[in-house]
Design a protein with these regions (language model features):
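Mature catalytic core of soluble alpha/beta enzymes
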Residues: 3-186
């Protein structure tokens, strides 16, 4: 890969994510020009898993700091069968609790939240810290889009559910823990 191709691809993917999220994901809204960090972990996991599959790897899980690209399920050598990966979503109010489990053979999952890194996501519309959700998990075919949309849901909160009715997001699922009178609801 050349850096020019990577930059061009990332630029285009960021533009698509901005459009799909009504601007809630906007890497151009930061001072200094362009910050695609809400998309690149998922993009990197996709790229690495695609390289592995092209090299003949049938079963892989690529973890880019919690954003996962999953290919081919995992081989249970005891049972002699391929099973989907079981991926748990953590409760942001009690990190020892799993609140949802997804079974994924081929696809991606990304979670964005404030429970590990604190309030680090900026609402591009207001310039203030995003308070739309406590955590957002998106499951779908492409890690870059899961990553970007999970970031956008942190900005959009409950209003962001409408984005998942767009044809481009068919097959993508959202699971969010929202803020409500200082309590979490799912």
């Amino acid at each position: 890969w050349s850096s020019d191709v990577c930059s061009s691809d990332l630029w285009d993917l960021c533009a698509q994510a901005k459009w799909l999220s009504d601007g809630a994901f906007d890497p151009w809204a930061v001072e200094g020009g362009f910050d695609p960090s809400g998309l690149v972990k998922g993009w990197a996991a996709d790229a690495a898993s695609n390289i592995l599959v092209a090299a003949g790897v049938q079963h892989c899980q690529v973890n880019a700091a919690g954003d996962l690209a999953l290919r081919g399920g995992w081989f249970d050598s005891v049972a002699g069968v391929v099973k989907p990966w079981s991926i748990g979503v953590v409760n942001p109010d009690n990190r020892s609790e799993i609140v949802k489990v997804y079974e994924i053979s081929d696809g991606a999952i990304a979670t964005s939240g404030t429970y590990e890194r604190g309030a680090h996501i900026v609402d591009p519309h207001s310039g203030m810290i995003a308070i739309g959700a406590k955590s957002a998990t998106v499951v779908g075919a492409d890690g870059w889009l899961c990553d970007a949309m999970a970031t956008a849901v942190m900005v959009g909160g409950t209003d962001s559910a409408k984005w998942f009715g767009q044809p481009e997001l068919a097959g993508y699922q959202l699971f969010g823990v929202i803020r409500q009178d200082r309590k979490s609801t799912r």
